[in-house]
Swiss-Prot record:
Catalyzes the dehydration of methylthioribulose-1-phosphate (MTRu-1-P) into 2,3-diketo-5-methylthiopentyl-1-phosphate (DK-MTP-1-P). This is Methylthioribulose-1-phosphate dehydratase. Its EC number is 4.2.1.109. Substrate binds at residue 102. The gene is MDE1. Disulfide bonds: none annotated.
Length: 242
């Protein structure tokens, strides 16, 4: 029998307690540790969120991502309003932690059917946004083709994966002073590029989402590989598109 003193009424701690390694409350800390080793979530930046069974599980804001524990995870009922923040339906909210500033942007991905959304501060993502701006101006998008790793990125919902000769296009939006203020631009980019699974944020990082946790993770890895490769290709004077 559970000791009720361990879980005060209304805390809903049972939502983040599971022996299943695939449970979102266990997956998010593991993913954040992995992303930290890759330099994607340095200095408390970035975030990860998973949608499952009418709930949204989100890593907290302003914490060292490699040290997150299951009990640090916020849980929202889904669907839930993006704005105002006070209208969001938190059913588990750790008292000493702050909700993720990425929340409305993650919700934008979930509203389009994603099962997982990842935000990183990858240096390679930042660098390609600057290179695109210099070469194409602020309205340019990142484009690359004839690279094998492109096969790790979907063509669009239910359209299969990109091929070697296909051109990958990732929209770029301008950064804002506050994370939540990116939401409108992110949603506009999603509308203009309905097949995209990622949006770059200039001088900031990238948002990536996928139908499942595994797909979001592998797509994020593939994109970061392509961004790093693109930076190195640029150094050698090699074109991204043939």
């Amino acid at each position: 029998m559970t000791d009720q003193r361990e879980e005060p009424q209304g805390s809903n701690d049972h939502l983040v307690r599971s022996s299943d390694p695939e449970h979102p409350a266990n997956l998010i800390p593991e993913l954040c540790k992995k992303f930290y080793t890759l330099g994607w979530v340095t200095g408390t930046g970035g975030g990860t969120s998973i949608r499952r069974d009418g709930h949204i599980f989100i890593a907290p804001s302003g914490v060292q991502k490699e040290m997150i524990k299951p009990e640090d995870i916020f849980v929202l009922s889904y669907p839930t309003p993006k704005y105002p923040p006070s209208a969001r339906q938190y059913i588990r909210k750790p008292q000493e932690l702050k909700p993720s500033a990425c929340t409305p942007l993650f919700l934008a991905a979930f509203d389009r059917g994603a099962g997982c959304s990842i935000h990183t501060h990858s240096q390679w993502a930042v660098l390609v946004t600057l290179l695109v701006e210099r070469e194409k101006g602020k309205n340019g998008c990142f484009e690359i083709n004839n690279i094998e790793q492109i096969k790790g990125i979907p063509k669009g919902k239910g359209k299969g994966m990109l091929g070697f000769f296909d051109t990958l296009r990732i929209p770029i939006i301008e950064n804002t002073a506050f994370e939540e203020d990116l939401t409108e631009s992110l949603e506009k980019a999603m509308d203009e590029y309905p097949d995209t699974y990622a949006v770059l944020v200039r001088r900031h990082g990238i948002y990536v989402w996928g139908d499942t946790v595994a797909k979001a993770k592998t797509q994020c890895e593939s994109l970061d590989y392509l961004f790093q490769l693109a930076v190195e290709m640029h150094k050698l004077g090699l074109p991204w598109v043939q």
